[in-house]
Amino acid sequence: GAAHAAKYGHDRYGKTYAGAYRDWKPGQKIHLIGHSMGGQTIRYLEELLRHGSPEEVEYQKQHGGDISPLYKGGQDNMISSITTIATPHNGTHAADLLGNEEIIRQVAYDYARSKGNKLSHVDVGLSQWGLKQREDETLAQYIQRVKQSKLWTTKDNGFYDLTTEGTDILNQKTLA
């Protein structure tokens, strides 16, 4: 949402995916299955459907603009069950030791940056952080813009979300 994007310094919208079940709506409950970090994502989706995001609602009141119905909550009749497979609900020690270390993030982000240029056909899914070269942008301009991305210093990423600290924050937000 807009509040989240403003808080962490990235674009509000990233890549958009077409829904797999286009007729999903309140009253038509579905069963969701998530593997690994997908289990965390599903749990947070259910939290938003049920309770919304007070932070997003307040931001919209103060700044105007549109707000997704997802952030308004009140949809506790959309998910029948959640099944998670190999989901690190309490984080992983590997993520604590390596996953969120600067050197690991740097290698991963350097790879992503190099694949975000106009000539690459690889989509690393980080366009919200500016890791996609614009059509009117030179390679030098792109590299300079990427250097200034807040991605390099944020905890708003999967590396952090898989740590025991990151999952503790998620667990406090969800009813699990």
For each predicted feature, which ranges?
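Active-site catalytic motif of lipid deacylating hydrolases and related acyltransferases
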Residues: 1-30
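Short, charge-rich binding segments
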Residues: 22-25, 35, 73-75
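Short beta-strand immediately N-terminal to the catalytic nucleophile in serine-hydrolase-like folds
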Residues: 32-34, 85
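Gly/Ala-rich beta-loop-alpha elbow adjacent to hydrolase catalytic centers
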Residues: 34-38, 42
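Helical cap/lid subdomain of alpha/beta-hydrolase-fold lipid enzymes
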Residues: 47-176
